[in-house]
């Protein structure tokens, strides 16, 4: 029987750390002193600052002391809770807060942060946490310091260094109550929109579900589109005011459609539904054209349609006849009638079983006084969509001829009467 071979042991062995993995071990104060000394030596040349930070990452433990590093770059030294600089600490003037308060200077500082975070990717999370903390400390900073931080944050949001989720800190109750959040947001959005445009800002906000929360920058008693619009328009941010107004309208439309469908499924009386819709139109400044499109969509979604083409037309006529009084209440303008016609055309084209039902629906609505002859003739002549155009125009040909003849007859009767 073979004896088991003795395995070699590792006791007494020493492994050398590769030189590039060695980091000098400091406490936060020593780390701060090293960074501040280096920044003082580079002076205000931000290119030299970026090079110094790049090289220092090989020797200093950025991962451990990320918060200290960013405190120094923004405020000039380590921040105490609340945002004040500790009196007994060393500080530097090579930082955001000591720089000039203008967009060009903040763009140059943004480049320093970009280069640093691109070089040391692991600092990304630490930097986001730092900005969230700084936003909570806003009351501890001077107005000028807030302005610089706002401009810098806007630029970093625009170039993707920061994620828009950091804006959550601005919804802090005390900051909102004292008007700090709204004032900060003005400077931030100005620099963000200056770098990109309102569409890019909207995309970033939507990604983090913040596109409908901007009114929360104000206390509850001031959270209205009117107040938001006035405040930001006067501050020179009309495009942001319009964006929020549009968001509010989109939200109101969705809410209107949802409530309409619930009312219809409950079988609420039309007079109650009409009253509710008119109130919503007034409250949210929604046009009749928008409303008729919502009602059409809601009416068509309340029923399970037959899959057989020969049966669906009859089912549609029966269903729509029932809802004609509701539709008629919101086609008081020619433009609303035309909108409805286009929605019917679109629906019949998108749902192939309805292709042959188009003309029957239009005739029903004409008889029920939902649609009148002028918008129908306009639709036929030049206001129709390209979708299924040849099929629908052919279907409507005889009815349109009848309408034209009826119109001519009524005109000649009027002339005879004169």
Curated annotation (Swiss-Prot):
Keyword terms of this UniProt record: Activator, Transcription, Transcription regulation, Translation regulation
GO BP term (any one): regulation of translational initiation
Ranges of compositional bias, category Polar residues: 1-14
Family per similarity comment: Belongs to the BZW family.
Protein name (Swiss-Prot/TrEMBL): eIF5-mimic protein 2
SUPFAM superfamilies associated with the record: ARM repeat
Location of region: Disordered: 1-25
All residue ranges annotated as the W2 domain in the record: 246-413
Function: Translation initiation regulator which may repress repeat-associated non-AUG (RAN) initiated translation probably by acting as a competitive inhibitor of eukaryotic translation initiation factor 5 (EIF5) function. Enhances histone H4 gene transcription but does not seem to bind DNA directly.
Native source organism of the sequence: Gallus gallus
Pfam family name, one: W2
InterPro entries: ARM-type_fold, eIF5-mimic_regulator, W2_BZW1/2, W2_domain
GO cellular component: cytoplasm
The keyword ATP-binding is assigned to this record: no
């Amino acid at each position: 029987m073979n004896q088991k071979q003795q395995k070699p042991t590792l006791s007494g062995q020493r492994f050398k750390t590769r030189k590039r993995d060695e980091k000098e071990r400091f406490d936060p104060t020593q780390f701060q002193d090293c960074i501040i000394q280096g920044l003082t030596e580079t002076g205000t040349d931000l290119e030299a600052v970026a090079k110094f930070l790049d090289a220092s990452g090989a020797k200093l433990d950025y991962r451990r002391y990320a918060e200290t590093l960013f405190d120094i770059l923004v405020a000039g030294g380590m921040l105490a809770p609340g945002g004040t600089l500790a009196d007994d600490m060393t500080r530097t003037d090579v930082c955001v807060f000591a720089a000039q308060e203008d967009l060009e200077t903040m763009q140059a500082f943004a480049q320093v942060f970009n280069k640093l975070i691109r070089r040391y990717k692991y600092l990304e999370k630490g930097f986001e946490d730092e900005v969230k903390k700084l936003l909570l400390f806003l009351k501890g900073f001077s107005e000028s310091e807030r302005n610089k931080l706002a401009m810098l944050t806007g630029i970093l949001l625009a170039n993707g260094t920061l994620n828009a989720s950091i804006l959550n800190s601005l919804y802090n109750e005390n900051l909102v109550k004292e008007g700090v959040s709204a004032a900060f947001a003005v400077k931030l959005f100005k620099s963000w929109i200056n770098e990109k445009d309102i569409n890019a800002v909207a995309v970033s906000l939507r990604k983090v579900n913040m596109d409908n929360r901007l009114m929360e920058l104000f206390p509850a008693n001031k959270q209205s589109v009117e107040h938001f619009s006035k405040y930001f328009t006067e501050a020179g941010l009309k495009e942001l005011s319009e964006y929020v107004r549009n968001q509010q309208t989109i939200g109101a439309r969705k809410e209107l459609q949802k409530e309409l469908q619930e009312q219809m499924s409950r079988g609420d009386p039309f007079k109650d539904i009409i009253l509710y819709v008119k109130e919503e139109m007034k409250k949210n400044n929604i046009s009749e054209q928008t409303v008729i499109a919502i009602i059409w969509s809601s009416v068509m979604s309340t029923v399970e349609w037959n899959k057989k083409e020969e049966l669906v037309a009859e089912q549609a006529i029966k269903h729509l006849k029932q809802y004609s009084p509701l539709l008629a209440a919101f086609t008081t303008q020619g433009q609303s009638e035309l909108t409805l016609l286009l929605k019917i055309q679109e629906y019949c084209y998108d749902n192939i079983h309805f292709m042959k039902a188009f003309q029957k629906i239009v005739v029903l609505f004409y008889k029920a006084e939902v649609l009148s002859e002028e918008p129908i003739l306009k639709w036929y002549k030049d206001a129709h969509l390209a979708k299924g155009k040849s099929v629908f125009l052919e279907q409507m040909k005889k009815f349109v001829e009848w309408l034209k003849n009826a119109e001519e007859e009524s005109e000649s009767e009027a002339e005879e009467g004169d």
